[in-house]
Amino acid sequence: MAEWHDTTEEYLEAILEIEEEGTIPIRARLVERLGLSAPAVSETVNRLVDHGYAELLDDRSLRLTDKGREVATSIVRRHRLAERLLVDIIGLEWEKVHKEADRWEHAISADVEEKLVQLLGDPATCPHGNPIPGSAHKVEGPASVPLTQLQPGPVIVRRISEKVEIDDDAIAFLAGAELIPGSNAVVIRTSTDGVQVKSATGEQTVPRKLAQLMYVIPA
């Protein structure tokens, strides 16, 4: 039962994160997101539907029920609080915290969650800039847009998509280039290959696929 509980949380978390990106959740995106086979994903999705966590719509997309959304929101909140703890208090490297928080999120009780909020000061975002559900603090300032959409000039990195966090090479590239939330950079030019930027470590080209998942604001 514990294994099914963790699997349920992982799937619901993935569906909610796909929604956050403005994308329609379908089984193919869960296959990509979770790195599992299509038959395995289909079997688990059917169980989610049978247990009342999600609905399979006529267009084959998935929609969380109120029950499923409550669980998904809770696990995303615990995950992002765990990431803040790992970075802010423990000092784990930014690029390592996502996978570590994946291990922690299932073990954090309501009492521990409450203490984490007090310890961390009820943060608005995780270290990757994504909002923590239920925080009393909201992200202020102009809405961020993908790096590919801005004209040349200075920018501030606001957040990195959850989709990037599961890509070891991409997250390592951003850490090495110091293109993490809160950092400053200058967009030099945008091309079909990507976005050439100058950061604290010098000039580099951010591949277009990655740049589309980096959200920035004009500096």
Each model region followed by its residue ranges:
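Basic amphipathic alpha-helical segments that dock to polyanions
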Residues: 11, 30, 41-51, 174, ...
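Basic, amphipathic "hinge/linker" alpha-helix immediately C-terminal to the N-terminal HTH DNA-binding motif
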Residues: 60-79
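Short alpha-helical segments that sit at the start of domains
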Residues: 1-12
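Short acidic, hydrophobic short linear motifs in intrinsically disordered regions
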Residues: 21-31
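A short, conserved structural fragment
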Residues: 49-59
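Key DNA-contact positions within bacterial/archaeal DNA-binding proteins
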Residues: 39, 95
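Mid-protein regulatory/catalytic core that forms ligand/cofactor-binding pockets
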Residues: 105-212
